[in-house]
């Protein structure tokens, strides 16, 4: 079956954005979908505006999709968009590492098929969605003044403003350095603590002004927008994004059927490092080095499909600038029985 990416795709329905590497994602999942036949269920763990799911549902006429998003507004919008596919799509309002328990407890036919046959494939397009960036009042974008919220699920957890107004100098500097790779993390943390004594942070414009004043002009000329790294770090901390990635990998790989594939799209080095490390561990035999064959029970149950981290082509980047930083890794299950469980647990 050939999947060349041709589809009557309406960019306006995807908030002005085309899903990153949609044709390549279909190619990576195609062998698993074809092997599963009528029982093929795909988990779109980062549903967003529904662009990847729409593409898969159109490209693979028999596939069913479980779409997961912690943002109820995104889930509602995507569900309306995918309503022409009727019962081939079901949405779940949850953080993506909760998909195992959602499948275990779900009542529709899609969940029943998944429980009986396992998941044929899964896609995780990590980071903030285009839809969330377009919602100015969410505070994800630094180019427009908005409340410093940044929660992907507006019902839960602390906001970016809470972090700025309550974290110690050490904790604030740590997240800026670790999650944003910010060279001036300590200097920025000092400025934040000094300014919040005058008035608590509430909106993004004040933080952006502080960053312009704190980061040296020479760096601003060569290092991109001075707010980019700080906003990324705050978003990752607010949403516990790296924790969710670490927890979902065992959840989704345990749920795969034999021949099933999990694909992760990362946009920053910390995300990709987590995926790479986990995939390497899952695909490595535990037989002691030097033995001529695997000992019983030590053979790897998974195999890495991609050679290193795949990158987008120049043609893809020209069509979709967001693809410039993407790194793609895929894993296939070789043996084992599918199971469904909560993060950090086993059934």
Curated annotation (Swiss-Prot):
GO CC annotations on file: cytoplasm
Keywords tagged on the record: Cytoplasm, Methyltransferase, rRNA processing, S-adenosyl-L-methionine, Transferase
UniProt catalytic activity: cytidine(1402) in 16S rRNA + S-adenosyl-L-methionine = N(4)-methylcytidine(1402) in 16S rRNA + S-adenosyl-L-homocysteine + H(+)
Alphabetical list of InterPro entries matching this protein: RsmH, SAM-dep_MeTrfase_MraW_recog, SAM-dependent_MTases_sf
Superkingdom of this protein's organism: Bacteria
Keyword check for Signal: no
Keyword NAD applies: no
Cellular compartment(s): Cytoplasm
Recorded family membership: Belongs to the methyltransferase superfamily. RsmH family.
Descriptive protein name: Ribosomal RNA small subunit methyltransferase H
Organism: Corynebacterium aurimucosum (strain ATCC 700975 / DSM 44827 / CIP 107346 / CN-1)
Gene name per UniProt: rsmH
């Amino acid at each position: 079956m050939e999947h060349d990416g041709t589809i009557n795709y309406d960019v306006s329905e995807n908030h002005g954005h085309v899903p990153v590497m949609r044709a390549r994602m279909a190619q990576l999942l195609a062998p698993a979908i074809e092997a599963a036949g009528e029982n093929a269920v795909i988990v779109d763990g980062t549903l967003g505006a529904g662009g990847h799911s729409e593409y898969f549902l159109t490209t693979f006429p028999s596939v069913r999709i479980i779409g997961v998003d912690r943002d109820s507004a995104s889930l509602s919008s995507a569900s309306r968009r995918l309503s022409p596919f009727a019962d081939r799509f079901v949405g779940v309002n949850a953080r993506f590492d909760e998909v195992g328990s959602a499948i275990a407890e779900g009542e529709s036919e899609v969940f029943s098929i998944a429980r009986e046959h396992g998941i044929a494939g899964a896609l995780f397009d990590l980071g903030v969605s285009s839809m969330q960036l377009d919602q100015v009042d969410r505070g994800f974008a630094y180019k427009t003044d908005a409340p410093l919220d940044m929660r992907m699920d507006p019902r839960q957890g602390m906001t970016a403003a809470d972090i700025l107004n309550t974290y110690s100098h050490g904790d604030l500097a740590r997240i800026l350095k670790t999650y944003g790779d910010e060279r001036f993390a300590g200097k920025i943390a000092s400025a934040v603590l000094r300014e919040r004594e005058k008035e608590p942070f509430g909106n993004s414009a004040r933080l952006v002004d502080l960053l312009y004043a704190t980061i040296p002009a020479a760096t601003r000329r060569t290092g991109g927008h001075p707010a980019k790294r700080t906003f990324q770090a705050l978003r990752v901390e607010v949403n516990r994004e790296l924790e969710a990635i670490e927890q979902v990998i065992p959840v989704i790989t345990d749920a795969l059927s034999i021949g099933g594939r999990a694909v992760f799209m990362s946009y920053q080095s910390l995300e990709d490092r987590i995926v790479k490390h986990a995939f390497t561990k899952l695909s490595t035999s535990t037989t002691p080095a030097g033995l001529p064959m695997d000992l019983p029970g030590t053979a790897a149950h998974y195999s890495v499909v991609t050679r290193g981290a795949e990158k987008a082509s120049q043609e893809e980047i020209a069509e979709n600038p967001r693809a410039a930083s993407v790194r793609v890794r895929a894993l296939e299950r070789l043996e084992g029985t599918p199971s469904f469980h909560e993060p950090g647990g086993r059934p």
